[in-house]
Amino acid sequence: MSLSFCGNNISSYNIYYGVLQNPCFVDALNLVPHVFLLFITFPILFIGWGSQSSKVQIHHNTWLHFPGHNLRWILTFALLFVHVCEIAEGIVSDSHRASRHLHLFMPAVMGFVATTTSIVYYHNIETSNFPKLLLALFLYWVMAFITKTIKLVKYWQLGWGVSDLRFCITGVMVILNGLLMAVEINVIRVRRYVFFMNPQKVKPPEDLQDLGVRFLQPFVNLLSKATYWWMNTLIISAHRKPIDLKAIGKLPIAMRAVTNYVCLKEAYEEQKKKAADHPNRTPSIWLAMYRAFGRPILLSSTFRYLADLLGFAGPLCISGIVQRVNEKTNTTREMFPETLSSKEFLENAHVLAVLLFLALILQRTFLQASYYVTIETGINLRGALLAMIYNKILRLSTSNLSMGEMTLGQINNLVAIETNQLMWFLFLCPNLWAMPVQIIMGVILLYNLLGSSALVGAAVIVLLAPIQYFIATKLAEAQKSTLDYSTERLKKTNEILKGIKLLKLYAWEHIFCKSVEETRMKELSSLKTFALYTSLSIFMNAAIPIAAVLATFVTHAYASGNNLKPAEAFASLSLFHILVTPLFLLSTVVRFAVKAIISVQKLNEFLLSDEIGEDSWRAGEGTLPFESCKKHTGVQSKPINRKQPGRYHLDSYEQARRLRPAETEDIAIKVTNGYFSWGSGLATLSNIDIRIPTGQLTMIVGQVGCGKSSLLLAILGEMQTLEGKVYWNNVNESEPSFEATRSRSRYSVAYAAQKPWLLNATVEENITFGSPFNRQRYKAVTDACSLQPDIDLLPFGDQTEIGERGINLSGGQRQRICVARALYQNTNIVFLDDPFSALDIHLSDHLMQEGILKFLQDDKRTVVLVTHKLQYLTHADWIIAMKDGSVLREGTLKDIQTKDVELYEHWKTLMNRQDQELEKDMEADQTTLERKTLRRAMYSREAKAQMEDEDEEEEEEEDEEDNMSTVMRLRTKMPWKTCWWYLTSGGFFLLFLMIFSKLLKHSVIVAIDYWLATWTSEYSINHPGKADQTFYVAGFSILCGAGIFLCLVTSLTVEWMGLTAAKNLHHNLLNKIILGPIRFFDTTPLGLILNRFSADTNIIDQHIPPTLESLTRSTLLCLSAIGMISYATPVFLVALAPLGVAFYFIQKYFRVASKDLQELDDSTQLPLLCHFSETAEGLTTIRAFRHETRFKQRMLELTDTNNIAYLFLSAANRWLEVRTDYLGACIVLTASIASISGSSNSGLVGLGLLYALTITNYLNWVVRNLADLEVQMGAVKKVNSFLTMESENYEGTMDPSQVPEHWPQEGEIKIHDLCVRYENNLKPVLKHVKAYIKPGQKVGICGRTGSGKSSLSLAFFRMVDIFDGKIVIDGIDISKLPLHTLRSRLSIILQDPILFSGSIRFNLDPECKCTDDRLWEALEIAQLKNMVKSLPGGLDATVTEGGENFSVGQRQLFCLARAFVRKSSILIMDEATASIDMATENILQKVVMTAFADRTVVTIAHRVSSIVDAGLVLVFSEGILVECDTGPNLLQHKNGLFSTLVMTNK
């Protein structure tokens, strides 16, 4: 076999004129550096020298970067590209020669291998931080530079120049090798690892030494950054274990909110300084954002420009390849030049295919890099803005919130909406300047291809694009309207769920259900409008390119002198697709730009709003230990009785003989000549001169609205000081100087506000409030506030979460936790603002005695107490009496008795009145009621937890095995069953129509492209000149018209099907819930049910339809593309299998990880928003405690947690898109090579390449939409889980027509051996109860908690399961009656009075059956007639949600009037007087005795004494009727249970 390295000609090996004069030997010389590098590096890499010699042990795989790291990677990639060009040029040149010449491409191949090895070698050296091994690379670059220079000089001597491609390639390689050599020299200079005694040691970045930092994008090498390779571990591991917050770790320092806040704050402060010089100018947030975040946006824009320019390589390469195939130029030349020119090189179809592949890889890499940089910058901006807003909230003037200048809703909008608007605008920013370039370039290329006819198509796009903007504005309007109706529907649904027990007992479910359905119909009407405009938007996106292509090609057919060529046609098609995208995106960018401008205006207004006065603003926080408090020096002759009973008389007090403030300078706070305002300019408090003694109890009293709370806030610095000063004595000296201690240096104050404010945290965290936990102190505080019994009822004790995300507590319980927080804090001063307002007398007394007098005063803490409980004045060491914003009197009680007798007598009168009310209140034990409510909530919560556990077990699909494969199978499985269930909810006809229209539409689109391929191929081959094209033009026009029509049909059917499914699912859900058993509502939290009607319904309404449309469109486009490529070049099917396998695994791994990350993003948003709202609500408390820094830190942590979740989600999306884009590029390369090699039909080649390019755009959308749909189907699954619930059996064995019209007329009740339980699997709550109630008899039922009293009342209405025995009313067994009939004929008054929003008339008679006279009669009986008449509208007067515009007593009387309206002969009162005062109870009892004198009344007693005179008393114990007789007879049995209950309640 002859030698072929230099060719078969022996003269090729001639070295007569010298070795360097032979080009072949020069090429062989170029092999030396590559062989050297491979010989040196391979042993090092295989032995693992670098990794074993690592001097720095860190947990990550990527590490420090040597100097010039990024430049080295860029130069290496450039060198690899040039090597590819050199290989291609050598192969093409060799193909034109008679014999094989390996020297033309073999050195280039070795160079490619060596360069690849160099970057692998460098990466390993860098990760091991062992720079001495870089010496091999330095030698390699030097040798490569020398050999390439020799080669370049040789070419120069031969007379080659820039017109010769090989000369240009060699020149570029000399430059690149020289630059890489310079990079190595720089590393030697900086690291000093050669010829230096003391090498420079470099530690890895600080972030990488933190084990918690898992977001490695800033630290990895350039290749890993571009491909997100470092995400592989997380995404693959998601199959084995769900991704949690621990897995994603912490943010790197540079990305943390505090870092970005500092940058933005400095930039904004600079703008404020500039604006200060111009009175009419406001600081520019835009400029501040540009200064802080401009550089990454410019970098992103650069990436975007490069991506967009590379995007045009696709159409150009398609044109070139199709043209080459059409001309059939791929033949061997007999005569060939020594070297190729660039033009000749690019005329090779295979070269164009490779260039197209590389261009796609680069384009997609740059595009994803642009996306990532903008998203990261947007997240950083959002974090900085949130920190700025939060910092401003902490400095916000209290008057802004209290006077309504700024609402909590506005602040929440700033946090949740405006910052997101700016973030999204930043995401779209690069489009602003990239789009014009893309459009201009597209039009120029189209014009070059098709001439003036291309301008017609461009004009069609430009003219139709504004319609998209119009549609977008209409979509926004429809969405706002939908949101309004949705809010109204949720409000009504919430009312139904809160009052479901009453609705069922009164058989009003269908009335209220109808009301919700009416609102739902309005919402659906708005959703129809939204769906219509969405359909139009989808239609325009699909139809405009078709219309533009039609207009262009028809114009070209008749106006141009030439036939349409395949190269021109398919390149134009590709260009039109590129051109349409920026024009459509323009409307979105403009819309977001307008929103961003508005958001910046709102943000600027907020940041420039009034702040709290500088004299009261604190930079630090801290508390002084008790030991540093100034000790009380007075002599106390007689201790205060801490245990005296709850009766107080002013005349019987003994004043503690402590030194008065007038006699000592031991004063904690002093206000002189104080005038304070809430910002209006008018003084709310005037002429305030007060002193608060240290270590004593100061009480502030006065009428409602006199300024007591305002005085506390003024002292705390929350009000605007118009005049005067507030002095704090916090200097631990024997003679403190007040003039030297201003309020700016005051210490923290433990403050309990009048309105209780709690964190969304555990009970313990609310009480300790950031202070160290001290078990002994904590127990003392909870005992002092009577909290321990309440804590014992909670499922997790004091570790139970309270607030929005936890247990809802009553007002009294919330108040006591707030007071406990103030008591627990280690502060010298305690401010308590009306702490007794929500407490009953027992709790008030206990708190006063144990909490204030014992716990606080024994520690000599200064206590300032605002109260209306004048009976506690006897304990005050100092009293401040206020009236109309001024101090009326100040001093001890003795001083006031002596100096202001009139005031003293007034207090005595008020105390006597309070004492009379106290006699009544002593019987009403509010605490018992609160704890009973809490116990019920806990019972429901535990049951709900049990249900959730059962649901989780069901979700694991019966066959749960604790092994890896099972876990992976469950986590990767798509919920196809749920998808099918959703689709069929929209109706089989619409489902069929959607599938059929979708398939038909894509078939027509394929037919359009195939017709074009046939048309252009036919006329380019058979009719080279001008020919009649009417047939093809007509066919093309018809198909385009059909395609446009089908685009509209498909978009409408998808939206319509989604709307129908949403309508049916909500209708079924509402009916299922409202007809569900009462047990379901007892065991399922209200928030959980409401979530199905809010978040889940919103997903079904608005999110699933567009996702489904996008998924079906992108999937069918990809399938069409694969089908068309396979048809054009069948050999492509061979490569399809491995590509399909790769795609399968990519989507499989991504879907699981994406779902976890999306859930993390959603779950971390709520705590952040809650923290902002709770801070704004508790601003005064936070500032009083001086906990601003702690709350700032918490906000920064929550922001970073949400940001890291969002960043990982974004990185996961980039991970997917890079891989699917690269997969698409591989498809394009495979299709190109297959088309060139196997097809002679240029039209089909163009068609195949066009569809291959389409795949690159839609592959990632298939996976993204699949992942989104999987998450969204979770909402459908949740709704479906409720639809499987069993409803109450509303049917009876009797027909409603068989029930007498006036039944029950007599009111006779017979209870036969009654056994009742709540569910089949639960124990009985009533066992074999037998009783007889005569018509019109008044019956009392009593027993201890849990004895079964309320269960009996529910049994009358069949709200519980009567599994044995029966109840017969007026001769009819109630189990045979239809439920609606039974419940509509009985009346009940519940413990909790429930009113619904609407009118008084609606609340009394929702069925609208009664006349006005009957309603007025009922109101008169309930003693409400005069009050209702005084209201505007009378019977039509407005009732707010929950009846909050009426007192609890009035609401209960309305419930009584409601019961009377029904005219039933049986009335059941279930602890109806438990939550009302004594006066209202007397009214209610009187009405019942008169208005219901001839009716049977069954009273379940809250206070046993109220049923002593009842005609029949039933006493229950543990579900058994133990006593049954008249009250007097039962009292004769001294050891009986009834007697015991009566004695206990006395």
UniProtKB/Swiss-Prot annotation:
Localisation per UniProt entry: Membrane
Protein topology in the membrane:
Multi-pass membrane protein
Q: Which residues lie on this side of the membrane: Cytoplasmic?
A: 52-72, 123-132, 189-301, 370-421, 475-529, 591-987, 1053-1124, 1264-1546
What are the binding positions for ATP 1 in this chain? 702-709
| A UniProt-annotated Pfam family | ABC_membrane
User: What is the tissue localization of expression for this protein?
Assistant: Isoforms SUR2A and SUR2B are found in cerebellum, eye, atrium, ventricle, urinary bladder and skeletal muscle. Isoform SUR2B is also found in forebrain, liver, lung, pancreas, kidney, spleen, stomach, small intestine, colon, uterus, ovary and fat tissue. Isoform SUR2C is expressed exclusively in the heart.
What InterPro entries does the record tag this protein with? AAA+_ATPase, ABC1_TM_dom, ABC1_TM_sf, ABC_transporter-like_ATP-bd, ABC_transporter-like_CS, ABC_transporter_C-like, ABCC8/9, ABCC9
Which ranges are annotated Acidic residues under compositional bias?
A: 948-963
Q: What is its main location?
A: membrane
Q: Which residues lie on this side of the membrane: Extracellular?
A: 1-30, 94-101, 154-167, 323-348, 443-453, 551-569, 1009-1031, 1146-1242
The ABC transmembrane type-1 domain covers 297-595, 991-1271
Write the record's keywords in alphabetical order, separated by commas.
ATP-binding, Glycoprotein, Membrane, Nucleotide-binding, Receptor, Repeat, Transmembrane, Transmembrane helix, Transport
What functional role does this protein have? Answer: Subunit of ATP-sensitive potassium channels (KATP). Can form cardiac and smooth muscle-type KATP channels with KCNJ11. KCNJ11 forms the channel pore while ABCC9 is required for activation and regulation. Can form a sulfonylurea-sensitive but ATP-insensitive potassium channel with KCNJ8.
State the family it belongs to. Belongs to the ABC transporter superfamily. ABCC family. Conjugate transporter (TC 3.A.1.208) subfamily.
Relate the assembly described in the record.
Answer: Interacts with KCNJ11. Interacts with KCNJ8.
Q: Which named protein is this?
A: ATP-binding cassette sub-family C member 9
* Species, as recorded: Mus musculus (Mouse)
Upper taxonomic classification of the species? Eukaryota, Metazoa, Chordata, Craniata, Vertebrata
